[in-house]
């Protein structure tokens, strides 16, 4: 927890699955780094040089990061953008119950904003879903 990588040159580094929870990456060069499945929750990324289309979104119900415009981590779940867009209601519910079901449209809004508009599952517009999340 909290590794000091301030100003480190991690250009092209394979950080896939790395636990960078709480790491100090202030000013680090992460261009070209493979950050898929990396845990960046609580990491200090100020002035870090990140790969294209890489974002850390704070202030949501879950920690959210988008890596290389391809992978999205929400809480402890890390999947491709396409996988997130196609999940069934049951698959989302299995992640974190009703809380995840309520948050899922917001997550898709975030993905749409940062990556571009995409498909949404039909079940999101069902009356059954609307009733379930407003109970």
Across the structure, where does each feature detected by a protein language model lie?
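Tandem repeat scaffolds
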Residues: 1-62, 66-68
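N-terminal capping/linker segments that flank leucine-rich repeat
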Residues: 51-135
């Amino acid at each position: 927890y909290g590794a000091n990588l301030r100003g480190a040159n991690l250009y092209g580094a394979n950080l896939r699955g790395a636990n960078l929870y709480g790491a100090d990456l202030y000013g680090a060069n992460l261009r070209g780094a493979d950050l898929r499945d990396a845990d960046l929750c609580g990491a200090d990324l100020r002035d870090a040089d990140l790969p294209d289309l890489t974002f850390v979104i704070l202030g949501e119900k879950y920690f959210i990061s988008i890596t290389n415009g391809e992978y999205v981590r929400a809480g402890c779940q890390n999947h491709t953008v396409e996988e997130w867009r196609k999940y069934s209601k049951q698959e989302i519910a299995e992640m974190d119950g009703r809380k995840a079901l309520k948050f899922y449209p917001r997550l898709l809004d975030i993905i749409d904003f940062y990556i571009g508009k995409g498909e949404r599952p039909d079940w999101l517009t069902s009356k059954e879903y609307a009733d379930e999340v407003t109970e």
